[in-house]
Amino acid sequence: MIATFRATGQTGIMIAGEGLPIDAVVCDFTAGAAEVLSPDNDADHWDVIEGQGSLFHPGYAAVTLGLLHGSQPDAIVVCHEVGRRSHAGCDYPLPDLVECIDMHVAMGRRTNPGLRCVGVCLNTRLVPAGERRAYLEEVALRTKVTCVDPLVEGPAAIVDELLRGTPLAPADAARAAPQPRTA
């Protein structure tokens, strides 16, 4: 596999030595900048695009949406810190991980209908070591995707899911179908 890290933030640019600080791009041009950053490639080449912010952050959602629409990803990984209840500096509560996955996939499918969420990466520093595995398994069952703490166990399970290369995993196909809402 050939892979290129596409940095979109200042820290990523320092690590990679190149990239595009997407938060410095005028909002109207964010999607176009993201598209330039991640051109079409051969099937055996992966662009790993550094994500920014969240669709749920009142100050940075436009950056996230532009990056999501412009890069037109085939797969996304949702990242979260266990115990975080709101975005820094905001009183708006964070959504449940399932809602977060559903919203990011729905918005991403506007420009790539085949988009799927391949996993959740959690920072579990607040979870006792003896409870970590059970916690990750519970989140995986609830979200129906692979769940790891890459800081503890590495990202191999997420990479394995990416390598499966299926157009739509069964869990994502079920999630994509309209679901009845309950009160």
Identify the function of each model-found stretch.
Residues 1-183:
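Flexible phosphate-sensing "switch/lid" loops adjacent to ATP/NTP-binding sites
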